[in-house]
């Protein structure tokens, strides 16, 4: 049995945190492959190393001196090395980084050095092999992740190492230049390594004890979810819930590898299990609540819309022509509403409206701005009557007007539209009725 373990930036921010990570890895001999992030914040006003690297490279790109900034980054890593009492010298690595910064090697290269250097320290600390992600994780000429090549090369390389560290966040282009995943991409690297290693479990260690039912910035001390399916997690991640990068779900989902989200600062907690399917009933009717602000709705009306073949396609074509993706499209007999990101839409709204008139000839178009979408997700909703009614009741009790409700055919989620100003109150009301009072 083997486990791939990924540790986030907060778990590796200092030597003290490194020691916790070392104890966790050594406590289970099945934790054979480690994916580290760059050092995060040591305290609330601290700066993440990735952000320090971005700022440092920005000066280099402008042809300005970046010595002080690079020295500060060196000091962060040296503090960790000294705290772990390692005989490790990164000076040659920093000479290469300085040279490449002066050669304007790009933001992707700059950002990736945080994980790269942390990986070297981690491998030295654990006595594991170090595998530079640029040699085993690949992107194609269009900058898209090359899953087939990566899996083949990485699987062969891991077979040569019983225990290894693979830095997160980056890989390489066909010409050898470094390319990063989107922010939070170390989660993706961990998933890719788990797939290539044919791991039994992918452990994702962070600073929370699992995936929470709701955003702790809105709900005080929300409960952790014990078990959640990939489909549920995908719905919640898409609607803004954070802990695991949404693209990290797919590689392990394909292989049926479960993910266990754990807390570095509380390793005794079981965390959250993310699985393909389960016979376990969720503790509550809902599994989680998530949402985003900043949407607007484009409401289109036309008599006899339901009998006009291709009407919806024509409307959506107007959005496509302007490079705007939609979030949800609830509809009635003579009405159709398209929800889009407001910041994406506002600069092109008149072009889109003109396009809808040209393509679909509607009777009326009305635009409403400053809306929020909330997803209530749970496999338990399918077998429970009255879930939507309870949501309406909770929101009505708080005098919140529901702008839209849309339930997927799978009955896995219900999407509610409310005003931006009602967003936090709405989430509190929904959490209260399903988790606290359970009315």
Regions found by a protein language model. Name each.
Residues 124, 262-264:
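Internal glycine-rich alpha/beta core junctions
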Residues 2-3, 31-34, 128-129, 162-165, ...:
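Structural motif
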Residues 244-246, 255, 265-272, 346-349:
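Surface-exposed amphipathic alpha-helical tracts and adjacent flexible/coil segments at the periphery
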Residues 1-244, 249, 417-419, 438:
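Nucleotide/pyrophosphate-binding catalytic subdomain
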Residues 270-439:
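A conserved regulatory-domain signal marking ACT and ACT-like small-molecule sensing domains
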């Amino acid at each position: 049995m083997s486990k791939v373990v990924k540790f986030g930036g907060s778990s590796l921010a200092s030597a003290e945190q490194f020691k916790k990570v070392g104890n966790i890895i050594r406590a289970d001999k099945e934790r054979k492959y480690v994916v580290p992030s760059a050092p995060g914040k040591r305290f609330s006003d601290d700066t993440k190393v990735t952000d320090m690297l971005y700022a440092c490279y920005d000066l280099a790109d402008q042809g300005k001196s970046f010595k002080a900034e690079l020295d500060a980054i060196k000091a962060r890593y040296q503090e960790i090395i000294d705290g772990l009492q390692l005989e490790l010298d990164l000076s040659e690595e920093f000479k290469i980084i300085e040279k490449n910064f002066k050669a304007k090697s790009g933001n992707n290269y700059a950002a990736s050095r945080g994980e790269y250097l942390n990986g070297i320290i981690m491998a030295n600390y654990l006595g594991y092999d170090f595998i530079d992600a640029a040699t085993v994780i690949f992107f194609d000429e269009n900058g898209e992740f090359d899953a087939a090549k990566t899996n083949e090369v990485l699987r062969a390389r891991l077979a040569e190492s019983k225990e290894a560290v693979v830095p997160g966040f980056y890989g390489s282009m066909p010409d050898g230049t470094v390319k990063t995943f989107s922010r939070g991409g170390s989660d993706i690297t961990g998933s890719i390594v788990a797939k290539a290693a044919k791991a039994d479990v992918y452990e994702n260690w962070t600073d929370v004890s699992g995936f929470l039912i709701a955003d702790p910035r809105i709900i005080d001390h929300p409960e952790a979810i014990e078990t959640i399916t990939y489909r549920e997690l995908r719905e919640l991640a898409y609607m803004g819930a954070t802990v695991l990068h949404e693209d990290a779900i797919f590689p392990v989902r394909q292989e049926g590898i479960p993910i266990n989200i754990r807390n570095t600062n509380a390793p005794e907690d079981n965390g959250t299990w993310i699985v393909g399917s389960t016979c376990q009933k969720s503790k509550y009717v809902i599994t989680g609540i998530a949402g985003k602000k900043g949407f607007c709705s484009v409401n289109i009306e036309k008599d006899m819309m339901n009998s006009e073949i291709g009407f919806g396609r024509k409307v959506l074509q107007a959005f496509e022509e302007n490079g705007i993706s939609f979030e949800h499209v609830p509809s009635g007999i003579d009405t159709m509403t398209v929800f889009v990101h407001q910041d994406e839409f506002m600069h092109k709204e008149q072009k889109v409206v003109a396009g809808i008139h040209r393509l679909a000839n509607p009777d009326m178009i009305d635009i409403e701005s400053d809306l929020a979408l909330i997803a209530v997700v749970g496999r338990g909703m399918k077998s429970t009557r009255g879930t939507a009614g309870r949501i309406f009741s909770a929101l009505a009790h708080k005098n919140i007007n529901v702008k839209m409700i849309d339930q997927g055919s799978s009955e896995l989620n219900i999407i509610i539209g409310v005003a931006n100003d009602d967003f936090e109150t709405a989430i509190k009301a929904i959490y209260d009725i399903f988790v606290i009072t359970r009315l």
